[in-house]
């Protein structure tokens, strides 16, 4: 049997409907920057969607992933995995298969470095850590959060 992932989900309600209908996974994505510039950013929609499906199915993030720090942020906001598009195509255009391999190596190395700088030893650990957002809120376990003032701790899940 083939797994079916529902893509283009930005709403927790849509994610719930997809899971109830039998989706094997959710891809949080939009068409911003191509067809609809002013839609909700995938990264902004991710926490609410991930919380709604509550680990019943994998949640993937598509859109805006350019570096390892982007991957880490997505993991901390609830993604189980990310999809890479443009960076891989840029590598392909520049150096073919070797370019694609190099892009993937760079993203992996940046992810490892960002995890080390955050004191995170594994992807699973990253998913349970606190992420500080400069919009005045903290996502993650408020017991782990030690944000500098004036940020406030709020629960993510």
What are these language model-derived features?
Residues 1-61, 68-90, 144, 157:
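Alpha/beta enzyme core
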Residues 64-65, 119:
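A short glycine-centered flexible hinge/capping loop motif at secondary-structure junctions
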Residues 88-89, 95-157:
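C-terminal extensions of enzymes
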């Amino acid at each position: 049997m083939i797994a079916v992932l529902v893509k283009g989900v930005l709403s927790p309600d849509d994610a719930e409907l997809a899971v109830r209908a039998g989706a094997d996974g959710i891809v949080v994505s939009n068409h911003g920057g191509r067809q609809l510039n002013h839609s909700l950013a995938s990264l902004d929609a991710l926490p609410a969607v991930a919380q709604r499906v509550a680990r019943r199915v994998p949640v993937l993030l598509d859109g805006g992933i350019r570096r390892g720090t982007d991957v880490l942020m997505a993991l901390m906001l609830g993604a189980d995995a990310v999809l890479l598009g443009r960076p891989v195509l840029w590598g392909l255009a520049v150096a073919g298969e070797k370019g694609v391999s190099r892009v993937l190596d760079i993203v992996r190395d940046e992810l490892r470095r960002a995890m080390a700088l955050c004191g995170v030893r594994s992807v699973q650990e990253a998913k349970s850590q606190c992420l500080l957002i400069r919009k005045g809120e903290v996502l993650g376990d408020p017991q782990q959060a030690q944000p500098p003032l004036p940020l406030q701790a709020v629960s993510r899940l």
